[in-house]
Amino acid sequence: MCIRDSPVPAPDTGPDAGAVWHYGDPLGEQRAAETEALVIDRSHRGVLTLTGADRQTWLHSISTQYVSDLPEGASTQNLSLDGQGRVEDHWIQTELAGTTYLDTEPWRAGPLLDYLRKMVFWSDVTPAAADLAVLSLLGPKLAERAVLDALGVDALPAEAAAVPTRGGFLRRMPAGPAGRLELDLVVPRAEAADWRNRLAQAGVRPGGVWAYEAHRVASRRPRLGMDTDERTIPHEVGWIGGPGQGAVHLDKGCYRGQETVARVHNLGRPPRMLVLLHLDGSADRPATGDPVQAGGRAVGRLGTVVDHVDLGPIALALLKRGLPADTALATGPQAAVAAVIDPDSLPAAEQIGAGRLAVERLRGGAG
């Protein structure tokens, strides 16, 4: 399969600087991700490794996920919080062949590595940068025999699991609301081009990160630093859940920021919620970080903005919790861009946490 056009680089000022934005047909690439098979070079992501006998129990003690005995081949999300429970780092974690792999945003790999090294103390663990590239694959045809042969596997791994490949591993991501097939191929950086060529020969079309971002936003998956800000706590963006389901396990021991996690869980009311917005495409495009307004008052913050092949201009946004789905919203320069909440993206009806239930019983507010 030949590349249709020369690669168009991602904007230098954006989070994917240095990556390919698209190959001349961005909407066609998105369609291929839904109906065929697409490979996206995300090698600008940072990859770290942890080795040593204490790596799992040590990381368990300083992060939010339950990973002290993460099984061979398992993969999960994980976080590092500050003392107030606000998100500092998010990564995808994979356990394979005596090594724990962490991949994270390009601009956070260095700070995360510095933090991990500072926390080693007397533990038998060595954090290091890894010269590995992440290639993401989308589409239903990834399960076809020709693609499996190109990947060097007999069958795809289970969701939230990984299998070794030549010099790296193949990881299957959770399907999400749309149930779409998504894989990550993590391989030596020097071999990434060879892997892309092999996949192209198997019928997998090359695509840019625009296609990946459209898929991610439509799936309502937040991205650190784009859909989060300096105040974000895990409950606001759907990161609560055990291995393979979320990034924060609610039944584990002490870690930095745990008090906030427990308090918000017990009270049951995080201050904000992550939603999908549909934007008016006739106005100037808004930008990440723009305020979202209702009735002239700020009610939230705009996250990733992207044009989707089926949904048109969409964005993720952190909005004041409890805002009705039919609220008229505006964002962008001079609040000139109309926006509406996708009702399917609203959080499930809130359950009253144990702490709040006790308070309301004392006040006579609950039976």
Regions found by a protein language model. Give the residues of each.
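Glycine-rich, small/acidic residue-mixed loop/short-helix segments
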Residues: R4, R231, V237-V248, R256-Q258, ...
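Acidic, proline/glycine-enriched N-terminal capping motif
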Residues: R4-T76, L81, R86-E88, G367
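Short amphipathic beta-strand starts and helix->beta connectors
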Residues: P26-T35, T76-H90, V120-F121, A162-M173, ...
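Acidic, low-complexity central loop/insert segments
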Residues: L38-V39, V47, D89-R223
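Short, surface-exposed ligand-recognition loops at beta-strand->loop->(often short) alpha-helix junctions
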Residues: L50-R55, L137-A143, H278-A287
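A common structural junction motif
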Residues: Y66-V67, R117-V125, L199-W210, A294-V299, ...
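Glycine-centered loop/turn motifs
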Residues: E72-A74, D154-T165, R220, G225, ...
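Anionic-ligand-binding alpha/beta catalytic cores of soluble enzymes and soluble regulatory domains
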Residues: V186-H278
